[in-house]
Amino acid sequence: MSVRRALIALSIAVSPLAVATAAPVAKDKLLVPPTGAVHYVVVSDAGKHGDIWRWTLPDGRTAYRHSQSLRGWITETDQVTTLDAAGLPQKVEVRGISPSGDAAETFAISGTKASWTSTADSGSSDGRSGYYLPAGGVALSNEVLVDRLVAAGAAGIDLLPSGHATLTVGPNLTITGSKGPKIIKLVSVRGILSSPITMWLDENNRYFADVGSISTVPAGFEAIANTKAMRDLQEATTATEVRSIARRFLTAGAKAPVLFDHVRLFDADKGVFLENQAVLAKDGKIAAIGAAGSIPAPAGARTINGRGKTLVPGIWDSHMHIGDDWSVLANIANGITSFRSPGTEIDQALSATKRRLSGDLLMGEPFVSVLIDREDPLAAQGALTVTSEATTIAAVRKVKAAGLWGVKFYTSMNPAWIAPGAAEAHKLGLHVHGHVPATMRPIEAVRAGYDEITHLNFVMMQAMPQEVVDKANTAARIEGPAKFAKDVDLNSPEMRKFYAELKQRGTIVDPTLVIFEQTMTRDGGTPSPAYAPYMGIISPVLDRSFKSGGHPLVENYTRNDYRKSFAKMVGLVRELHMAGVPMVAGTDGWGIELVRELELYVQAGFTPAEALQSATIMPAKVVGADKRTGSIAVGKEADMVLVDGDVSKDLGALRRVVTVVSDGTVMDADELRKAAGYSGKPR
């Protein structure tokens, strides 16, 4: 499953995650683009995924049509937009189906009142003007927003339902398409997300393309989606800004000794909380630990009073893909000082790591694995694609040559190539994990060489009907567990034998349970527990997405059926934990979901200390770094987080980060959040 939060392009940034509330308009009832319609394509390095068209209707309204299949996730939508004299949307209607269900959405202005209804929310605004940014809709329709931002200049424009956006112009670049060379310019849009969104304009300052892991480009320019010059320029523009932020925090003064006194200390090695402790960090290491008041502060040291607060090791997100430079900065602000990135392109991983080591990027320490998938229409974008056992082994060797940590096999892999690929990876000292390929059961993947199973739905595949297992490289990997998990007997002899073998082999599980809480249980309209504490502090657009619903209901299943299946998923975590199967906490999201992941582990029977170990010492052990980090112990690296509250009683206190120490550098969390684009503290 890929619930990527990179949101590199504006098209992804405003896509809905909403539950179907009524039967969506069928594909054959949607608008049909005429000959001569402006044509865009959606592509990645895995190939073409879809088409988007735009044309003008006889009455002057603008129509859009989007048709896409991304690894089996279907989008069939249309949109009609009416603009007023100022070029702002006066009326918008969206129809069809997205991967998350019914895409229906309407917006209209009557007099001074604007009203909207989407699958995420509904509301109105009386007297406030602005550009209505759909919760979903056809991505290309946001070309109108770009036009308005260009016309507005530095002042920007107000957004509806709320927010304010601006556009800044960057450098030009000459590219070549089917009609010859073309000059385009890079721009950044702010106010949509907490970080800028980059896109490209043509020579007339009109929207031209989004280029990223998934790109939207004009037909005839498909090749530019993987043009190194475009990606390099995008990265360089962002890198310049984040470099100045990194230098602001990574100062000599920030590396001075620091003494935390009168703190509640979490000993991750023993899994206990110790009251009224003192911890001294010096020269990037933990120098001393003792009773409060027992450690003298060295000359030039900073002393922090920790009364009412808890000092924990630097937090790990064991499933957080390296996104843009801003997302990794936000994770530092949330106390994530180390992370595993299970599926990152080699060049991106090497660039980010190099800039981190040089002090140009504020990012936790990454442990990166690379996707390997069979060349197939359903292959993962960003993967090294293979066509045989030999090319699988070659891909594994390429990952090792890059100096990265592991390989992550994906759902379209030929099962016959897993064992030889895993054997080569182990010979080279690489970690092997991933989704379980279609037609394989998880125990078969483990026997073939998996050290770890990624995502709990693939663990649940052990008990799924064969027709679900056979299509695990499609939406069946979500819909199967959503439909059938509720009926699984977790205590059956077969499942008990399964748990025992996972334990015996030392197999690790990366549950990402928080994903399934969102996809299986949510009706929409209110923020999920993972996001509620962040409402109002990141961006208005994300606030709307945080109120989205779950995966669309299929066949005759109800949301209550899905909720029962999620309860069984929580039960599966409980059974794995009781059987002694090690688990590491990850999000496959923004990172802000991590605390909710830990809260769900407590629901599954973990103690708060055990849950916190899954995000500290346990992942450090998995990556082989536990001798130097993962716990607060004398001689280890000074990776620590001071949070407001008693974590032993309330894991939610982990959201209230006060101070972050990464490799001995002391940083104020309020300043980090501000730099990352947050407007306040999570609740």
Which residue ranges define each predicted feature?
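N-terminal cleavable signal peptides for secretion/export
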Residues: 22-80, 91-106, 151-177, 220, ...
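Active-site neighborhoods of metal-dependent hydrolases
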Residues: 395-413, 459-604, 677-683
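Solvent-exposed helix/loop surface patches that form functional interfaces
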Residues: 25-28, 32-35, 102-185, 232-237
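Contiguous hydrophobic, core-forming segments of folded domains
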Residues: 74-142, 193-204, 208-220
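Histidine-rich, glycine-flanked metal-binding segment
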Residues: 270-312
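Acidic, glycine-enriched loop/beta-strand segments at the rims
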Residues: 248-250, 265-278, 291-293, 607-612, ...
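Divalent metal-dependent hydrolysis catalytic cores, especially in the metallo-beta-lactamase
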Residues: 329-350, 365-371, 400-413, 422, ...
